[in-house]
Amino acid sequence: MAFLKKSLFLVLFLGIVSLSICEEEKRVGEEEEKQEEENEELSEEELRERRAWLDKLKSLGKVVGKVAIGVAQHYLNPQQ
């Protein structure tokens, strides 16, 4: 009878340890998924910021180009 009790306790103990390890791995996996989602969100925000800067730079380049063309035409045709 004592042998059966010890065996039963051993099985229950190993089952509980196994269950706690699985739960811990599950929590770690969920935390990693959350971290990846946050990183994706940050990268999306960074992409939006970069696009905004590129749009501003593009429009600034257009303005500078028009001014340069106007200045060049003024110096090439000073009579106007």
From Swiss-Prot:
Tissue specificity of this protein: Expressed by the skin glands.
Main location: secreted
Ranges of compositional bias, category Acidic residues: 30-44
Signal peptide: 1-22
GO cellular component, one term: extracellular region
InterPro entries: Frog_antimicrobial_propeptide
Region listing for Disordered, in residue ranges: 27-46
One Gene Ontology biological process: defense response to bacterium
Species per Swiss-Prot/TrEMBL record: Boana raniceps
Function statement: Has antibacterial activity.
Proregion positions: 23-49
Transmembrane spans: none
Protein name: Raniseptin-2
Keyword annotations of the record: Amphibian defense peptide, Antibiotic, Antimicrobial, Cleavage on pair of basic residues, Secreted, Signal
